């Protein structure tokens, strides 16, 4: 899979301990709108999340999309898009480095939407499926980006790549 971008905040010391996380995220486009997860905090993100121990990337992608959106991925439509690499000081350990690989896949889903299976924090943020015009999603995220959440910066980068792709 091709590397799309490196996000390195350089806000850590090289001798810090590092923690690596691997995640899969879905790019689902329907009628020139992209499927995103909407939060009541005001941001939009790609559906997806962490890969569990022993799980393949594809299995993680299918599971995460179902859990966060209720959409069922058509496995035979899954295509690699690319991945991002993030490196920054950990939010949970002052002397830790957080490294994340986010693997993006283009895929299609069945029309039927079933019940979400959300974590407590996702319930608190009222995660819901939203098919968004890319410019609208970028605009909403730009307002939220005041807090400089790295996942918003990462997902906005991907949204801009998709915008160029579907022109």
Residue ranges and their predicted role:
Residues 28, 106-108, 131-133:
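Short, well-ordered beta-strand micro-motif
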Residues 72-83:
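A short coil-to-beta-strand element that immediately follows conserved catalytic motifs
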Residues 51, 84, 109, 134-137:
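Hydrophobic pocket-lining residues within nucleotide cofactor-binding pockets
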Residues 29-68, 72:
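Conserved Nudix-box catalytic region and its N-terminal flanking loop in Nudix hydrolases
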Residues 43-44, 114-167:
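Nudix hydrolase/Nudix homology domain
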Residues 1-25, 31:
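Acidic, metal-coordinating catalytic segment for phosphate/diphosphate chemistry
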Residues 86-116:
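Active-site-adjacent beta-strand/loop module that shapes the phosphate/pyrophosphate-binding cleft
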């Amino acid at each position: 899979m091709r590397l799309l971008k490196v996000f390195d905040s350089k806000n850590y010391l090289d001798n810090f301990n590092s923690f690596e996380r691997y995640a899969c995220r879905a790019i689902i486009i329907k009628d020139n709108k992209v499927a995103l997860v909407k939060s009541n905090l005001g941001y939009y993100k790609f559906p997806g999340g962490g890969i569990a121990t022993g799980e393949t990337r594809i299995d993680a992608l299918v599971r995460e999309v179902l859990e966060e959106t209720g959409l069922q991925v058509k496995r035979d439509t899954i295509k690699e898009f690319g991945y991002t690499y993030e490196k920054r000081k950990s939010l949970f350990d002052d002397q830790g480095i957080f490294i994340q690989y986010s693997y993006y896949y283009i895929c299609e889903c069945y029309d039927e939407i079933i019940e979400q299976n959300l974590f407590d924090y996702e319930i608190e943020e009222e995660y819901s499926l939203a098919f968004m015009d890319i410019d609208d999603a970028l605009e909403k995220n730009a307002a939220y980006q005041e807090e400089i959440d790295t996942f918003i910066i990462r997902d906005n980068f991907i949204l801009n790549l998709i915008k160029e792709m579907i022109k």
